[in-house]
A protein has these predicted regions:
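Function-dense linear segments that define catalytic or interfacial modules
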Residues: 308-395
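Short amphipathic alpha-helices in soluble, non-transmembrane regions
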Residues: 587-595
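Short active-site loop/helix that positions an aromatic residue
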Residues: 77-89, 102-104, 231-238, 354-368, ...
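Conserved catalytic core of nucleic-acid polymerases
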Residues: 240, 302, 311, 390-558, ...
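Active-site palm subdomain of RNA-directed nucleic acid polymerases
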Residues: 166-178, 541-575
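Active-site-proximal helix-loop-helix substrate-binding element of RNase H-like nuclease domains
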Residues: 33-40, 44-59, 63-168, 178-180, ...
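Conserved catalytic palm subdomain of right-hand nucleotidyl-transferase polymerases, strongest
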Residues: 7, 73-74, 95-98, 342-356, ...
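Conserved "right-hand" nucleotidyltransferase catalytic core of DNA-directed polymerases
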Residues: 1-10, 15-17, 33, 39, ...
Length: 621
């Protein structure tokens, strides 16, 4: 293994300028940014503190052999971006102890250096940073700057210790994926089209203003912005406010979200006044499009588009959006997707793994008839819809079968985890892609029964998972699954790549089973456990394919010649690369080839994919 260098920067911050108010990207690129100093450790040697003028700090960093070293930091997105953007230095390999910790501690102590050090090193993180508020490098008294240096050195020592704690739980390929994701942020290649964004912002604000004009005189903005006040507005109109149980607090809360089925249904209320206030509420509360567009414009003015993904951001190992910018749910074909573009003479190549979760659940449960249909490229959605409606459905060739095809798709993608009739009915009502189906409850019940009868092995694995939970909660081990038998222990489910889906302190309660989450107990049952495992397995498949693609592209990457070959982004089950336009067709074919081959541990899993090439993210979808 090459030389390791542990590094930690201390930087200027104030009441108005810091990571609590700024994104990481904005903070580092802002004109107020200043490095106070940094600490470093080479291999297991002595830890050093460096401060001084900008030139002295730059020379000290350049004196370290970082380009040929494995760089270790805690929260690499911060320190790695400072190195890359401010000093033009990139290491041979990024090792981020925050990313390394998440698969182990994400549900318990979290990822802060202080919490991890206390639990795993039995050591305390210092607090000297608090005294640095508002002080630029030239403002520090000598003694305070020296104390700050000791504080920084201690952070480096803690990071070094945590690296040795967590490396045992991070297989080499997962470390590569962490490095890949860090480079999406520290070495960005995507750009933003400011003109597209400015036009879109005008349209969004104009639409919101017109919505407000409709109800300003009768309701007022304050009532729309406040959940309790808006509840009173509905009650005065004779409507009982819909409620739900908050996943975060586990307490009852108003169901006024854009995807809350009962609230969305009020937009079709027979009283026009109710329609108006609900539409206006959705408009004024749905400021995500507006604020995200404004954020994109700011990034466009500062430079390229860094993609910060939280490695293992979800319980099942999937990534989540970071830096207050989630690209996981951009509207298809919308202006925000269209604004994401590439450097001159380059193209964007996007390949999406097809129905990966539905394929994995069928394979893992041993549902051979469904696996065979996937392998033979049968239109599964139309096939199952034909059973539901008692006639031949062909959603691809018959435009009149569009709704029925949507129902079939919802069944295949939604019923594999034990979804009941009520939720199935609500899911159809919420709709997707402009289609919404108001299925009677008795029809929803029959459809769920049809699915469970036809795909009985999938229904059986929910029961097997429930039995596994009982064994695990008693401290026993067992195996679960047909396509691959996974080892289940009291700690969780062991995955084929050496990671785990963890269930900390799994136990039986009066209602079933629960485990410790970040915000309190989390309910778990057979169908949910199957969903967790299938998502984790699907994630391994796609991320392993992404790593294979990236390994090949890195061989050709040449930033100095402005010829980039790079995996730039991953969204759900999609991999997005940027390559010179002259090789875009080759890259598409290569990515399609890679993503049609499963890993060795699931060599008989039928995987498929589709992709395209474009000048922007919308065109490549």
């Amino acid at each position: 293994m090459p030389q390791t260098i542990v590094l930690d920067f201390e930087t200027f911050y104030s009441q108005s300028y810091g990571l609590k108010k700024y994104t990481t990207e904005h903070y580092i690129r802002d004109e107020q940014f200043q490095v106070i100093g940094f600490a470093y450790k080479v291999d297991d040697g002595e830890t050093h503190w460096v401060t001084g003028t900008d030139r002295q700090i730059t020379e000290a960093l350049q004196g370290l052999d970082i380009p040929n070293a494995y760089l270790i930091c805690h929260n690499m997105a911060f320190d790695g971006a400072i190195l890359a953007w401010r000093y033009g230095i990139k290491p041979k390999y990024y090792l981020d102890t925050l990313s390394m910790a998440r698969p182990v501690t994400g549900l318990t102590v979290g990822g802060s250096l202080a919490a991890l050090a206390k639990k795993y090193l039995l050591d305390e993180k210092g607090t000297e940073v608090v005294n640095a508020l508002g002080l630029r490098r030239e403002d520090f008294p000598a003694d305070q700057l020296a104390r700050y240096g000791e504080y920084c050195k201690h952070d480096v020592d803690l990071t070094y210790g945590l690296y040795h704690v967590f490396k045992q739980w991070n297989p080499p390929k997962e470390l590569y994926i962490q490095d890949l994701m860090i480079r999406m942020f520290t070495d960005p290649v995507l750009k933003l089209d400011k003109n597209v964004l400015v036009d879109h912002l005008f349209n969004v604000q104009d639409k919101k203003a017109k919505l407000m004009e409709r109800i300003d005189a009768t309701v007022g903005r304050d009532a729309l912005m406040s959940n309790p006040k808006f509840a009173v507005v509905l009650q005065k109109l004779g409507v009982e406010p819909p409620m739900k149980i908050s996943l975060r607090t586990n307490k009852e809360a108003y169901a006024f979200g854009k995807t809350d089925q009962e609230f969305k249904a009020l937009a079709d209320h027979h009283d026009p006044r109710v329609q108006a206030v609900v539409a206006a509420r959705l408009g004024i509360k749905s400021t995500l499009e507006e604020t995200r567009t404004e954020s994109f414009i700011g990034i466009a003015e500062r430079g390229s588009l860094p993609i910060l993904l939280n490695y293992w951001g979800a319980h099942t190992g999937r990534a989540s959006g970071g830096d207050k910018m989630n690209l996981q749910n951009l509207p298809r074909g919308g202006a925000l997707r269209r604004s994401i573009t590439v450097p001159d003479n380059h193209s964007l190549v996007a390949v999406d793994s097809a129905q990966i979760e539905a394929r994995v659940v069928a394979w893992w449960a041993g549902q051979e008839d469904l696996v065979t249909d996937f392998r033979n490229n049968v239109d599964i959605y139309s096939s199952f819809a034909s059973i539901v409606y008692g006639r031949t459905i062909d959603r691809k060739k018959n435009p009149n079968d569009k709704v029925e095809g949507f129902v079939g798709k919802t069944c295949i993608l939604g019923l594999g985890y034990g979804m009941g009739p009520d939720k199935f009915k609500a899911t159809l009502k919420i709709g997707m892609g402009g289609i919404s189906v108001d299925m009677p409850l008795d029809e929803a019940q029959n459809t769920v029964k049809l699915y469970r009868a036809k795909y009985d092995k999938i229904a059986q694995i929910w029961k097997d998972a429930q039995a596994a939970l009982a064994q695990m909660s008693k401290g026993f081990e067992c195996e679960l699954g047909v396509g691959i038998a996974l080892r289940c222990t009291p700690e969780g489910v062991h995955l084929p790549n050496g990671t785990m889906v963890r269930y900390p302190n799994l136990r039986k309660n009066a209602d079933g089973f629960e485990y410790d989450g970040r915000y309190g107990p989390v309910k778990i049952y057979g169908g949910k456990m199957v969903e967790n495992i299938v998502q984790a397995l699907a994630r391994i498949v796609v991320f392993d394919q992404m790593a294979k693609i990236d390994i090949e592209l890195r061989k050709c990457d040449n930033p100095e010649a402005d010829r980039r070959y790079k995996v730039a982004l991953t969204v759900h089950d999609e991999v997005v690369s940027v390559v010179p336009t002259t090789v875009a067709s080759w890259c598409l074919n290569f990515m399609l080839e890679v993503m049609k081959v499963p890993p060795k541990w699931c060599s008989n899993l039928p995987v498929s994919c589709e992709g395209d090439v474009g000048n922007n993210y919308a065109d490549a979808k």
